[in-house]
Curated annotation (Swiss-Prot):
Role this protein plays: Fatty acid biosynthesis chain termination and release of the free fatty acid product is achieved by hydrolysis of the thio ester by a thioesterase. This thioesterase may be associated with peroxisome proliferation and may play a role in the production of 3-hydroxy fatty acid diester pheromones.
Annotated protein name in UniProt: Fatty acyl-CoA hydrolase precursor, medium chain
Gene Ontology molecular functions: hydrolase activity
Tissue-wise expression: Highest levels in uropygial gland, much lower in liver and kidney.
One Pfam family of this chain: COesterase
Species this chain originates from: Anas platyrhynchos
Protein family per UniProt: Belongs to the type-B carboxylesterase/lipase family.
Protein keywords: Disulfide bond, Fatty acid biosynthesis, Fatty acid metabolism, Glycoprotein, Hydrolase, Lipid biosynthesis, Lipid metabolism, Signal
CDD domains for this protein: Esterase_lipase
């Protein structure tokens, strides 16, 4: 294994990309005065980019959301005197610590693994800003929103130094309350919910007020995120609370329709109440009971819940109407938008997290049908058996062996959760007159060899390594992958600067139009159109049928 790694490193070195590791030496201790007080960070050298980056970790953008502030809107942070140390990673928000660490280790773009603590006091952000010896214009700002199903994840899993160094941008990674602390709702005034989304708005407000001190341009902010982070970006594009706080948006493998949203949060609240021993006769009493739980008790309640146990909800504040209604009524923050998916979204990491039956060698049809029935509920709540039949016949019915059954099942889950949802949102934004660029990421990382089964192509989250320049920080990549990473970083940063990803030396990325043109991103890139056209038509018709059935039932009542 070590020999293979050395070979890969030498391949990259011979391509003229030197010393892949940001040194981490704290030779320089940069200080910045923010609106709340002074902070002292440290400097790293990204040798491959021949540039240093100033790093500031754990900057508070809100008061700790503890005690009476649990299930409350975030409040501005308290100012401090003296110089605050900003050289240590903040704790990640309350979550299943084992799952959170597993996800962090799986997706980090660093060479080393960062051991993360958990705490309810977690509303912090990290800033990476390139060093310059001369006064320059203000730099575009990237704000990364991590994924993790709204129940796990951490800002510190993502090192923004390579992106900042190579492309002369400021990178901010933010945290937000997760799980019960982040999205618990009683569906009324006692706990409206969406606390995590309100935290994201608070972080963006802090950035508007303070990023100028880090050479960032508050008038050029691009929000981007993956999975639940992509859903969050999509939600912020729809929320009136976020209007004017950002200027471009990128959703990677996640949009705010069909997943991680409910119009009936009371059902979630009842399950949480039962797990917490807080089954009360009123919403007010339930909220008070949960507020009295210690942090350790909240962690134990979280561990009793299934993997994807909570969603954002219709609160009348962050979401005045459902995401689908806001989209259809074109009530959208008008910004250029990149939306994309990977070509094997439900290939490996998500089925494992959701404790799928062993599927590596294939599946029997009866097992696949049972799994399909349970997972369809993620996309279509209360899907009747005839809907299950239609999806089964479309994806699995014609399969001739266990491997084809497995592949059909995985696609039947990925397509509605990720692909069709992304296409739907892209169409709405296009029709509202906003510039949209769509992609499908197709590259299976070389680091997957011997770890991820060969049938998995570009799995959920695989693109993150290339967006954040992992080949230049962690190595373990081929020369072609280093080139791909630079290509993706250039597309993203061109978009942040100009609202258009295209630039010199890049394959032309067409705007998403009525021909639904998009970019296939692999070791080489090419334009294509109408991603999965037949399957998308299938899901469009099925969605219309389900909504028509619901309207008819509602009318009958």
């Amino acid at each position: 294994m070590a020999t293979e790694k050395n070979t890969l490193l030498s391949l990259i070195l011979t391509a003229g990309i030197t010393a892949l590791v940001a040194t981490g030496q704290k030779a320089e201790q940069p200080e910045v005065v923010t609106n709340y007080g002074s902070v002292r960070g440290y400097q790293v050298k990204v040798n491959a980019a021949e540039r240093s980056v100033n790093v500031f970790l754990g900057l508070p953008f809100a008061k700790p959301p503890v005690g009476p502030l649990r299930f409350s809107e975030p409040q501005p942070p308290e100012p401090w005197k003296g110089v605050r140390d900003a050289a240590s990673y903040p704790p990640m928000c309350l979550q299943d610590k084992v799952l959170g660490q597993y996800l962090s280790d799986a997706i980090t773009n660093r060479k080393e693994k960062v051991r993360l603590q958990i705490s309810e006091d977690c509303l912090y952000l990290n800033v990476y800003t390139p060093v310059s010896t001369e006064e320059q214009e203000k730099l575009p700002v990237f704000v990364w929103i991590h994924g993790g199903g709204l129940v796990s994840g951490a800002a510190s899993s993502y090192d923004g130094s390579a992106l900042a160094a190579f492309d002369n941008v400021v990178v901010v990674t933010i945290q937000y309350r997760l799980g019960i602390a982040g999205y618990f709702s009683t569906g009324d005034k006692h706990a409206r919910g969406n606390w995590g989304y309100l935290d994201q708005v608070a972080a963006l407000q802090w950035i508007q007020e303070n990023i100028i001190h880090f050479r960032g341009d508050p008038g050029s902010v691009t929000i981007f995120g993956e999975s639940a982070g992509g859903v969050s970006v999509s939600a912020l594009v729809l929320s009136p609370l976020a209007k004017g706080l950002f200027h471009k948006a990128i959703s990677e493998s996640g949009t705010a329709v069909r997943i991680l949203f409910t119009e009936q949060p009371e059902e979630q609240a009842q399950r949480i109440a039962a797990a917490a021993g807080c089954e009360k006769s009123s919403s007010a009493a339930l909220v008070e009971c949960l507020r009295e739980k210690t942090e350790a008790e909240m962690e134990q309640i979280t561990l009793k819940m299934p993997p994807m146990f909570i969603s954002a909800s219709l609160d009348g504040v962050f979401f005045p109407k459902s995401p689908r209604q806001l989209l259809s009524e074109k009530v959208i923050n008008a910004v250029p938008y990149i939306i994309g998916v990977n070509n094997c979204e439900f290939g490996w990491i998500l089925p494992r997290m959701m404790k799928f039956p062993e599927f590596t060698e294939g599946l029997e049809k009866d097992v696949a049908r049972q799994v399909l029935q349970s997972t369809l509920a993620l996309s279509f709540k209360g899907a009747p058996s005839d809907i299950v039949d239609l999806v089964y016949n479309e994806y699995i019915g014609v399969a001739e062996n266990r491997a084809q059954v497995r592949d059909g099942l995985l696609d039947s889950i990925a397509d509605p959760l990720f692909v069709f949802s992304a296409v739907e949102v892209a169409r709405h934004h296009r029709d509202a007159g906003n510039p949209v660029y769509f992609y499908e990421f197709q590259h299976r990382p070389s680091s997957a060899a011997g770890v991820v089964p060969e049938f998995v192509k570009a799995d959920h989250a695989d693109e993150i390594a290339f967006v954040f320049g992992k080949p230049f920080l962690a190595g373990n990549a081929t020369e072609e992958e280093a080139k791909l990473s630079r290509t993706v970083m250039k597309y993203w940063t061109n978009f942040a600067r100009n609202g258009n990803p295209n630039g010199e030396g890049l394959v032309h990325w067409p705007q998403y139009d009525m021909d639904e043109r998009y970019l296939e991103i692999d070791l080489t890139q090419k334009a294509a159109k109408k991603l999965k056209e037949r399957k998308m038509e299938f899901w469009m018709q099925l969605t219309e049928q389900i909504m028509s059935d619901r309207r008819r039932k509602h009318t009958d009542l």
